[in-house]
């Protein structure tokens, strides 16, 4: 009888120890994936500086695959929220690959649509979480003003056949970012809003590089900000699952 009484607490302690060990393993694996992402982004910047297409093909897919790994390690497959985030990240990886070739407008347009679909997936993920209406309203107004200003600056420089896709992209990324802010405002992890805002800001660098003035400076700040954004979103399933 005494053995039976002590077995229960001992089993609970063993389960807790195993859970802690699993958490440590996930943290180490996630950290390793983030380090790989950082290293690949650094190498990508070197390739961009040297305008090496071979370097871009070697480094960009690795950097993007790393944020997929971060999401998987963070438990993205364990919830509807996580699975939608993982879907969005996968579409972003596809967009990253499609944006590597230069001077091919059709491929670039396909990349834009891949990112557009990715933002829809992120927005759907945020709709699975509680949201703050006041935060949603403030974020929406702020984003309308900011993106309208960017549109006025960018639209005269766009090819005619790209104006409608870019307008649609602005609309979707604005909705996605507003929803992210609403989730964080309702008590959700701040990294959700931070990731969405960083993503939106990084797209300005892409737009300037593609349609206004192509120079390394755009990529020097836009690429690190973009990968930071997606790593933050990739980490969010682990925080959501604990909340």
Per-region residue spans from a language model:
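P-loop/Walker A NTP-binding region and its immediately flanking N-terminal helices
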Residues: 19
């Amino acid at each position: 009888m005494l053995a039976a009484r002590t077995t229960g607490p001992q089993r609970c302690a063993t389960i807790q120890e195993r859970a802690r060990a699993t958490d440590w393993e996930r943290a180490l694996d996630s950290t390793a994936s983030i380090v790989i992402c950082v290293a690949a982004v650094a190498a990508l910047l070197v390739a961009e500086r040297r305008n090496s297409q071979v370097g871009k093909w070697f480094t960009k897919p690795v950097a993007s695959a790393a944020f997929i790994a971060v999401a998987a390690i963070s438990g993205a497959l364990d919830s509807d929220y996580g699975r939608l985030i993982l879907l969005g990240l996968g579409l972003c990886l596809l967009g990253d690959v499609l944006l590597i070739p230069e001077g091919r407008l059709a491929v670039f347009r396909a990349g834009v649509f891949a990112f557009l679909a990715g933002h829809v997936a992120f927005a759907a993920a945020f709709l699975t979480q509680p949201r703050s209406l006041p935060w949603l309203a403030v974020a929406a107004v702020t984003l309308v003003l900011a993106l309208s200003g960017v549109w006025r600056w960018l639209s005269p420089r766009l090819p005619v056949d790209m104006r409608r896709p870019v307008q649609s992209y602005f609309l979707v990324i604005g909705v996605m970012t507003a929803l992210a802010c609403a989730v964080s405002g309702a008590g959700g992890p701040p990294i959700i809003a931070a990731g969405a805002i960083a993503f939106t800001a990084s797209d300005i660098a892409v737009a300037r590089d593609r349609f206004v003035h192509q120079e390394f400076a755009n990529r020097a700040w836009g690429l690190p900000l973009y990968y930071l954004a997606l790593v933050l979103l990739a980490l969010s399933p682990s925080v959501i699952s604990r909340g």
